[in-house]
Amino acid sequence: MYVVAGHKGHAEIVAKLGRAGRRRRLKGKRGRGTLTDEKPPIFGMLQRDGEVVIAMLPNVQRVTIEPLIQQTIQAGSRVYTDEYDIYNQLEQYGYTHKTVNHSASEYARDEDGDGFHEVHVNTLEGFWSLLRSWFRPHRGISQEKLPRYLAFFEFVHNARRRGKALLASLLAVLVTP
């Protein structure tokens, strides 16, 4: 029987699911994941200059995601998202909110006519590609350890952007008695 990576080491979960094995080549069901499913949702926010915040969430409901957005993103900031309905109320919280409509094959939009496509989420899509390729050699990560892997990847990604300033602050902490 094929065991999904999120259930590795948890025979009681697999037995409780009572599901038959599946072929590896078949794609899983499409849609947004939940912790009770085999693919927990990972939420990410990325500044255009490269700083990223990622977190594994129990679900993708507005009550879960909006507090995280409000804690992380300063009011008055521009926020670019897809048209998922949980983002509809961002303007009520003081954000300038622009969307791209992926279902209509819109991936970037030039709003002011200068030839530069300002409205897009391609930077974050590129980050997800990096994260997936980084996960690939691990061949499955349990749901218990996934937040640690995410935190490590977030740290490495952000530290790479900070460079010498991060190294200097780490050394200052280590040297200070």
Place the predicted regions along the sequence by residue:
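Residue-level recognition of single "structural anchor" positions
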Residues: 1-177
